[in-house]
């Protein structure tokens, strides 16, 4: 069984992330969306909330699971008995960073491959950071995030502004 792990912070999950998950689900027997717990970074959503939001978006896929992890990605990959780390690439800048990480992961566990998937052109400009910035200035975000979580994101932005 081919198991791929797609790691990230997903704060929030974007249409670009979801597109990659959908494409990976068609290539692997099982895809684990691995939500990174970064204690040094205050997210818009808690880890539990992010896991729940992603689960709402991927509910229709029988071969996609969502889990959180902390520590080394490679340790999580081994624990889940996965073969592959799945990484999305939007730009050359993404590639430079992800290439270095792939080499480091190969050094730590040469049995695990990293597969790079190029982001669909219509999502290549979308990032969680950009979405948060647009939302913080009352901009329209529904074109950037999966429809399943638009309301959740709008409610969170309102509460952060003190409107809710």
UniProtKB/Swiss-Prot annotation:
**Positions of ATP binding:** 9-10, 17, 88-90, 98, 123-129
By its UniProt entry, which Pfam families does this protein fall under? CTP_transf_like
Described by its record, this protein's role is as follows:
Reversibly transfers an adenylyl group from ATP to 4'-phosphopantetheine, yielding dephospho-CoA (dPCoA) and pyrophosphate.
Q: Tell me how this protein assembles.
A: Homohexamer.
Please, which domain of life does this record's source organism belong to? Bacteria
Q: Which GO terms describe its cellular component?
A: cytoplasm
Q: What is this protein called?
A: Phosphopantetheine adenylyltransferase
Which residues are recorded as binding substrate? Answer: 9, 41, 73, 87
Keywords, comma-separated and alphabetical: ATP-binding, Coenzyme A biosynthesis, Cytoplasm, Magnesium, Nucleotide-binding, Nucleotidyltransferase, Transferase
Q: EC no.?
A: 2.7.7.3
Gene Ontology molecular functions: ATP binding; pantetheine-phosphate adenylyltransferase activity
UniProt xrefs under InterPro entries? Cyt_trans-like, PPAT, Rossmann-like_a/b/a_fold
The biological process GO terms on file are: coenzyme A biosynthetic process
Q: Which SUPFAM superfamilies match?
A: Nucleotidylyl transferase
Indicate the enzyme's highest-level EC class.
transferase
């Amino acid at each position: 069984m081919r198991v791929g792990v797609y790691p990230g912070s997903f704060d929030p999950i974007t249409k670009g992330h979801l597109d990659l998950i959908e494409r990976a689900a068609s290539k692997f027997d099982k895809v684990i969306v691995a939500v990174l717990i970064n204690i040094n970074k205050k997210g818009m959503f808690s880890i539990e909330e992010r896991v729940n939001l992603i689960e709402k978006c991927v509910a229709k896929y029988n071969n996609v699971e969502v889990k959180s992890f902390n520590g080394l990605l490679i340790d999580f990959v081994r624990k889940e008995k996965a073969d592959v780390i799945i990484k999305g690439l939007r730009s050359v800048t993404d590639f430079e960073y992800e290439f270095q990480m792939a080499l480091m992961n190969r050094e730590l566990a040469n049995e695990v491959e990293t597969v790079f998937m190029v982001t669909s052109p219509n999502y290549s400009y979308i990032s969680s950071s950009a979405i948060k910035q647009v939302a913080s200035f009352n901009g329209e975000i529904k074109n950037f995030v999966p429809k399943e979580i638009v309301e959740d994101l709008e409610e969170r932005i309102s509460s952060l502004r003190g409107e809710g």
